[in-house]
Amino acid sequence: MKGILGRKVEMTQVFTNSGQLVPVTVVEVLPNTVLQVKTIDSDGYVAVQLGTTDKRVNLVNKPELGHFKKANSNPKRFVKEIRNMQGYEIGQVINVSDIFVSGEYVDVTGISKGKGFAGGIKRHNYSRGPMAHGSGYHRGIGSMGAIINRIFKSKKMPGHMGNAKRTIQNLEIIAIDQSNNIMLIKGSIPGPKNSFVQIKQNVKGMSSKQAVELLNRNASVQA
């Protein structure tokens, strides 16, 4: 397993040399620092704790500050642990080009956009009721089960929509710009702009393929 932490910037689109338009999400992947290495002997499992994006020292309490000092690192805003990732040392700095290459497939995890309180139609795609004047309900969720005095916990009902941890699997890496710490991922990923995401090696059967060649707009203008 391999992975890295990044920040969602925006969505845009690029063209390949064959003229195909590809929608992509721009992810800023600043250098990640290895803050802790967990092993089976000491922790019972294998994992690497990564941190990215510096934050002010006065926003960190003493236990956290001591944790960062062990890795000779500045305090980090986004700290996450990636399991089954090994071969790294505390304090090591990881760049995106050290982990992934164009053409690989990844799983992206983030916190989805919060939608607030939503009804059953918007939240769970329920069908609405009859809209005639004599109808007893229009946008209600209808029956809640066969037992009158009990509603099961799994029942889909109105409530808080969004703002939940979500993972989208098997997204293709279109391009990596190491000089600007930018990664282009095909399609959309969870979360609003400037939200932090985890980019990990895919766990299902999509294998990497040859990277697509993007159209160089500057070269075409000069020609």
Curated annotation (Swiss-Prot):
GO terms for cellular component: cytosolic large ribosomal subunit. Disulfide bonds: none annotated. InterPro entries: Ribosomal_uL3 (IPR000597), Ribosomal_uL3_bac/org-type (IPR019927), Ribosomal_uL3_CS (IPR019926), Transl_B-barrel_sf (IPR009000). It holds the Pfam family Ribosomal_L3. The keyword Nucleotide-binding does not apply. Keywords: Ribonucleoprotein, Ribosomal protein, RNA-binding, rRNA-binding. GO terms for biological process: translation. One of its GO terms (molecular function) is rRNA binding. The keyword Zinc does not apply. One of the primary rRNA binding proteins, it binds directly near the 3'-end of the 23S rRNA, where it nucleates assembly of the 50S subunit. NCBIfam families: L3_bact (TIGR03625). Belongs to the universal ribosomal protein uL3 family. Part of the 50S ribosomal subunit. Forms a cluster with proteins L14 and L19. This is Large ribosomal subunit protein uL3. It comes from Mycoplasma capricolum subsp. capricolum (strain California kid / ATCC 27343 / NCTC 10154). The lineage of its organism: Bacteria, Bacillati, Mycoplasmatota, Mollicutes, Mycoplasmataceae. The gene is rplC.
